[in-house]
């Protein structure tokens, strides 16, 4: 189906960042956003591109009280020929469908989603950065804004997309990769079996902020979550999936518990490693096994994967107050190769022999 969304241009364009090497993450927002409404009996309607600006919301809107919402995260990349492309949007669409089903949010057709992304990117195409390590972060989200205190699915929703030119999530001084410190604790959990861990919903992240604040006390950037049942098996790192290279095996937590977000970068990492002949296992891994591997020298690398950072190498863990160093604390070869390959594919500087990129403009 072909969609033609009306565009209302801003009359007060913002100054674009002067130095693309200092964008940071989500510090700037573009001139426009996409908005679309849903009403029960009518479906999705009135999609439009409008100026990015504050909007009114009724204080009794159900999202403010019962958190019926979802979001996605993706990036648009400037290619060497000046075009703009995105990475594996089919995976975002599938994950969005799973989240919507879990949260009782109406289905959003995949072709509509892609058309909306293209429309808002086209409106702000001059904002897409081109400096190394940069991209346009795309944040689609849906929330129920029916005015009601009833604990029931809303009958009215808004679908919106906002854009933010962004740099590297964890960048070294030269703009390349650097290692981070990660905190491991067994007091709080991210998700439990039967919950919303596999869905991309705000509550999963809001509920993790207490542990993230505790991590800062140990000079750590983020939290490595353990499982809810036994508090011993590694799951995710903050907003990312976690990988551990022990001896000749790369290990990541399995998805069958329903507590792990099925990351698009995670799937890409697994496929690339298998293509390169690296042994990859999706299995349970205890934090005790990780610590033991560090002591006997078999722990080669730990890294996180996600849309924001692509690949984020981990140099140290703080495990319940005790520091555990990963090899020599520097970026490992597998993490570096994965980053170079994935970011190269995303920006068009490395041939995409996997068919993962999607040209927008």
Show which residues each predicted segment covers.
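Helix-start/capping segments and mature chain N-termini
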Residues: 1-120, 148-361
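Intrinsically disordered, low-complexity linker/loop segments enriched in Gly/Pro
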Residues: 123, 143-145
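Charged, gly/pro-rich active-site loop segments
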Residues: 110-112, 120-133
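Extended, Lys/Arg-enriched charged tracts that mediate electrostatic binding to polyanionic substrates
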Residues: 129-139, 143
